[in-house]
Amino acid sequence: EAAVHVFGEHGYAGATTDAIAREAGVSQAYVVRTFGSKESLYSEAAAYTFDAVREAFRSAPVPPGASSEQIRCALGDAYLELVADRSKLLMTMSLYTMGAHPVFGPLAREGFDSIYRVLRHERGLAADEAALFLARGMLINTVLGLRLWEGEGRENASELLSFLLDEDAEHVLAAAAAPRPEL
């Protein structure tokens, strides 16, 4: 959790094992001894994050024989719980920019593909429904990751999120804009 938080807020390049150790309440030596390297720790944090996303979608309560609409609503509720943890949102977004990295690129591709497989094959969304669900999620992640509401962008952030989230938009925006602890 500590590594996801620090990597999410600062990215791979900006995060340090010292900051992660402070966040976890352990020594930097312990972090290095446990994980070996920052790259290994980032890989573990990536796996943890993708596991959390997959598990959230797998465990979304969907009644037997549910319609596509009911499935999408349950998955949407699970997604809203995920974005409440800004660290996981930012961690996945940073991973999606690292496609060319020799270690993190394959992790990001497999993570994204595994989420798609959960939506399609385990939760039963049609290909177009899964693609639209992911596209909407990526746009929401982008608005939140950019902190679009800061400065002159608040109206645009509110408009975009209202379109994407309906009645949950202001709640998500308020939670995302809440002050974060300094790392």
Residue ranges of predicted features:
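Alpha-helical structural segments
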Residues: 2-5, 9, 23, 33, ...
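Ser/Thr-centered, proline-biased regulatory motifs
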Residues: 12-22
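Residues in soluble alpha-helical coiled-coils and helical-bundle/repeat scaffolds
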Residues: 36-40, 62, 66, 83-87, ...
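Secondary-structure edge/capping motif, primarily at the C-terminal ends of alpha-helices
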Residues: 60, 64, 96-99
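Hydrophobic/aromatic-rich alpha-helical bundle segments in the mid-to-C-terminal region
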Residues: 101-114, 119-183
